[in-house]
Amino acid sequence: MQNLKLFWKSKLKLILWKKKPTIILKIKKNNKHHWFLDGKLNIYENCILNKLNTKNKKKIAIKYFSEKNNYEEYTYEQLHNLVLKYEFFLRFNINKKLSNSKLMLQSSTNIKTIALILACVKLGIEYCAVFEDLAEEGVLKRIKLFRPDIFFCNNIKLKSIKKYQKKHKFISLAFEEVDQLKNTMSSEKKLNYFYSNKSLFTLFTSGSTGMPKGIVHSSGGFLLYTIFTLKNQFGMNTKSTILTASDIGWLNGHNYMLFGPLCIGTTTLILEKPLNLLNSKFLEEVLNKNVTILYLPVTLIRIMRAIFGEKKFLKNSLETLGSM
């Protein structure tokens, strides 16, 4: 146990801390492990803010293909400006203390979803992402369990959600409302820092055998382990480009698609619809974006190999192929 503490103490430098923890691990009576209890940090500072005063602000943070395969790029600076819009919108609509608030979102894995999540992280708002195609009954179960103050979705789903908001005491908002905002640069506020064990986000199990169970992820240990595994298992560095074919409703959509790559300062390639990779022409276009790390569901890899053969993956830029 002592070696475990010493090991992770030596890895603290992998991320930025406002207050570096002195309590590395504490095991309480219920056998729950609490990591870095007295440490303080803000994950948004690790992912975005520490790039803005350097030349890396002009570096491509996200390469993004929409559901219709339209392609966009966002530098760290451009991504930050988009996050500011969502930060401003959340500050305006949340009446209670931001760091005590909870937000649930139902959306596909698109750039607006990413900006909303990063705004939540910056403000200390615990969030929960659910699959865009999850049935109304499944969404309602998660609302009852998570008890959000705000539910975020698109206009199409807003009508079905609104009928529950009075009973379950939340307000419902649409991504389209944020689109209407003009300049929100004045929303830059002093950055707050949070204890390492503060809840960052909650993801629910499928609930296929009963009620879904919420798995809560904190910030310090989550980010540190993510960075450690990306560097040591994936071989990621600042020159990497990673494609994690995941959904924002899965854990891999948070650690290896979003927070990890942005924290390291590399480029993450995000697909709104990963199954589009089964289209040969689209797969070719994606892999030509200088992907160095390809992280896919093992089932998808098998299907793609059966359709295209192994040579389709063997681009000169590709260094690591991983499966989830």
Predicted regions and their residues:
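Conserved AMP-binding A3 loop
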Residues: 73-76, 200-224
